[in-house]
Amino acid sequence: MKKCYEFVKKYKSKYPLTLAFRLKKHCEIVDKHLNPGEEIIYAFVAQKNNDSFDIVNTNVVALTNKRLIIGTKRILWGYFLVSITPDLFNDLTVSKGMLWGKVQIDTVKENVILSNIDPNSLPEIETNITEYMMEEKKKYKEREEDE
């Protein structure tokens, strides 16, 4: 089983324009919350905010075989973790600005905005998240129909 940091390191070397800091600490949070049998399929980093000039909200976004996890380690103590299961996923919006890209993940309960992303990575992020979520949503619908 690959650790989150290996995926993030690969992403950062491939897309160096993404603004991100303290990656190992953020990855530790994601790794800590992986459930038994859960494996990371894809991971990337971004700032979790709507403002391109706010660069202190680095989050690690990990797509696992069961859900999407967004985690960040706070500077002094504590951390934040958001878990998005396929049944709560609604929509994904990708936008490219002059310097960076932005990904908006719309869920039943909230709208998660990820910014300061290398624009060259946007197609890869969109493809990985959308294809996985749509495939999993089909499974949820099949289960509901069987019941």
Describe these PLM feature segments.
Residues 41-43, 62-63, 69, 104:
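Soluble periplasmic/extracytoplasmic beta-strand elements of cell-envelope proteins
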Residues 1-34, 53-54, 77-147:
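Acidic, Ser/Thr- and proline-rich intrinsically disordered linker/docking segments
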